[in-house]
Amino acid sequence: MAARCAVCGKGPQTGFTVSHSHIRNKRTFRPNLQPVRTTIDGENVRVRVCVKCIKAGKVQRVEA
């Protein structure tokens, strides 16, 4: 399953881990995705949404 937000489309980014001696190692920054039950087209569906979208209220949670 792709590490991508179902609402905003945020996905992984690449960058570097930089040590104290400034040695750079490539790494991946992944979005903080959480499974959320929400209603899409009248159906309760479980989607993976980033926490930024959850905090912004872009997703309405449905109780199981």
Swiss-Prot record:
Glycosyltransferase in keyword set: no
A single cellular component GO annotation: ribosome
Keyword Ribosomal protein listed: yes
Pfam families with a match to the protein in the record: Ribosomal_L28
One of the GO BP terms on file: translation
Signal peptide: none
Similarity remark: Belongs to the bacterial ribosomal protein bL28 family.
UniProt-recorded name of the protein: Large ribosomal subunit protein bL28
Source organism per UniProt: Bifidobacterium adolescentis (strain ATCC 15703 / DSM 20083 / NCTC 11814 / E194a)
